[in-house]
């Protein structure tokens, strides 16, 4: 104790001798240990360079912080305290361990280097080769932690009811932590949590608001039973009670989830229990939804995916859907299609035991509806299909086993139904007989409206 008082008194006397102005926020008190060694070297300015070894303990007078290290050097003229070997800093807001540390008294900034581990009062942990810690002092009410050299932050978020949950892990070239809840990450950002992984060039995280913004080539990947991948210019993630509820990508949104691929200027995903349930696509450009054998485009598209299984699509505004013709009975370069002001498509699972692939149940086009579908002809010639083209206010196409079963037209119905001509071979003429004539082609028969 006597040794600590002697060291503190010597340094205070040096500052007074130099006629120094008011001390910065931290006035060092060297408590030290019974075996601490002390060497003081006078500088031309009249201030001293103090070297301490064999165990050092330092604190700020009247403050709840403390630093311990193997050795230290205090330059009064520069206001720098250099600590070397097993450095351990503590205060109510944070604990920092490192191989070396420099305390800049004028800024109340700690620069820690070598195996730095900074632990916040919330339990969040930053690991890096170098970290600057700006203490919360007068004029800076919130602490700031700046880590470089590809740091890793384990951000602890309180769970619902106050219980702890798995931390969010942030990896980047540079991370700034404001307080213990706001994060700015830049360059090669990788954010991982239980059900989702996000990558971007820069990111902002506010754990109190449960909000994340990803910028510059962001990608979000859902890691549940049925994963999804979302891309866009900027992606926002909103959570509630630490569960992801909404993901918004704009511009150039692109999502891929099992049966569904969705492209639009803006894409909004809604999740329940961190499983994709709904998707909205809209923007100045056209929205496009693609399932295994079908494309739908419109001004905007709504997709229902309960339990992340495709069930419905609503295409609004000059909607157009096309699909590959029935390959079992038709060989054609033409695609089947249906259009209208609005198209609603409903889907089922392929089979009771196969819920990973959706097949169409029915499509309904409303408002100036038109449709073009091809069927196998009676002769079984795949290259010459039967064609059905109809128009009406409402057109409903029902499917059986994924293939067109019936086409129903309601109001203002018109159209044509064309069968391929008979391909029956005509026998050659016998001697003395004239060749038989080709039977006349059947007249076009319009489809029967219902």
Segment roles from a protein language model:
Residues 4-15:
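Bacterial N-terminal signal peptides
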Residues 19-450:
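N-terminal amphipathic/hydrophobic interface segments
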């Amino acid at each position: 104790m006597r040794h600590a008082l002697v060291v503190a008194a010597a340094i205070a006397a040096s500052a007074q001798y130099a006629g120094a102005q008011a001390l910065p926020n931290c006035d060092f008190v060297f408590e030290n240990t019974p075996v601490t060694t002390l060497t003081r070297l006078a500088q031309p300015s009249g201030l001293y360079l103090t070297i301490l070894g064999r165990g050092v303990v330092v604190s700020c007078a009247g403050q709840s912080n403390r630093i311990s290290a193997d050795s230290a050097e205090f330059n009064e003229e520069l206001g720098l305290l250099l600590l070397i070997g097993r450095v351990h800093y503590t205060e109510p807001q944070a604990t920092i361990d490192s191989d070396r540390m420099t305390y800049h008294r004028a800024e109340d900034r700690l620069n820690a280097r070598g195996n730095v581990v900074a632990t916040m009062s919330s339990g969040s942990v930053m690991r890096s080769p170098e970290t600057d810690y700006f203490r919360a002092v007068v004029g800076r009410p919130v602490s700031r932690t700046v880590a470089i050299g590809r740091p890793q932050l384990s951000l602890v978020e309180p769970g619902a009811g106050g219980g702890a949950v798995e931390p969010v892990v942030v990896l980047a070239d540079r991370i700034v932590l404001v307080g213990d809840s706001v994060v700015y990450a830049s360059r090669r950002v990788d954010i991982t949590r239980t059900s989702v992984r996000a990558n971007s060039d820069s990111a902002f995280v506010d754990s109190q608001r449960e909000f994340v913004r990803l910028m510059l080539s962001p990608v979000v990947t859902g890691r549940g039973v049925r994963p999804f991948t979302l891309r866009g210019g900027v992606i926002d993630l909103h959570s509630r009670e630490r569960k992801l509820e909404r993901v918004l990508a704009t511009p150039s949104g692109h999502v891929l989830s099992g049966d569904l691929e969705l492209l639009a200027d803006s894409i909004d995903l809604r999740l329940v229990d961190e499983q994709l349930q709904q998707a909205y696509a809209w923007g100045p450009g056209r929205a496009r939804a693609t399932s295994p054998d079908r494309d739908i485009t419109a001004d905007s598209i709504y997709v229902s995916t309960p339990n992340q299984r495709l069930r419905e699509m609503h295409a609004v505004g000059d909607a157009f859907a096309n699909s590959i013709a029935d390959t079992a009975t038709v060989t054609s370069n033409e695609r089947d299609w249906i259009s209208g002001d609005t198209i609603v498509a409903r889907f089922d699972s392929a089979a009771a035991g196969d819920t990973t692939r959706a097949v169409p149940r029915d499509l309904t086009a409303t408002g100036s509806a038109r449709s073009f579908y091809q069927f196998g002809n009676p002769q079984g010639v795949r290259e010459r299909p039967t064609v059905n083209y109809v128009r009406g206010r409402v057109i409903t196409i029902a499917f059986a086993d994924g293939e067109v079963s019936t086409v129903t037209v309601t109001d203002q119905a018109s159209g044509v139904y064309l069968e391929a001509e008979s391909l029956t071979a005509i026998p050659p003429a016998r001697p003395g007989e004239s060749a038989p004539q080709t039977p006349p082609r059947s007249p076009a028969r319009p489809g029967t409206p219902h």
